[in-house]
């Protein structure tokens, strides 16, 4: 069985269409972030972001950080004697939020139409922190969040979202991240789900703690619960994303971790542009991973960057094919 795994497409739907037309695989897994902005033009997105930041600051000052911003705004507008400024901005924010939901659903419909063209392959999708809950979209049948699917006898399950506030995305519609609680508390939604399902392959937008989770100038950002589960259960593959710069292949406690970096073009934390196009091809023989190839899509051509053989040990696992493109990522 051949699996193609991509993450963080950030609205690059044309690139996804090219990938599907230029590759052959039994299964495609497309992990969040699927969307870039919840509007059709940047000026509207900027206006929405500014209003959201305004109410976020007000929410902090009023010690109501536990409330979703949209609920906070609704409550404010029902409060007697609010200022004209708050009423005007709040009403506009409500209108933008309704529009954002409509645009998001339209964009997911476009993506679903593209994925539906590949009828002979299984294609799954996972929401990231830029996405709304996919169960309310055209992608609901492909959704991996808190769901599992059978892939030729292997069980794949996913957990989406991330433990971060994402400005510019309506909080009301995103997947609430329930993977932060201590495992021993019994209230970690992600851990409890995986413990009940016992998946062979895990897809998680947020990486595991200490593996592909380092953010420039901030340090590690991964999920301790995900790492704990994989370390103590027979997980073949843990496929993650979210942290674009800490990509790679790593094996820990017999689990193979993969982060392909971003597939869609993104702006980096340092202000540069990461053009993306990266993905993994994973070859499976029964329950064994026989080979992994790290690749890059450039326009309509696919370039092999590195091969990985999990059966070998140490540095022998990796063979660099395209030294120039490989070094450009380091």
Describe each region flagged by the PLM.
Residues 122-125, 141, 215-285:
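Conserved beta-sheet core of the metallophosphoesterase superfamily
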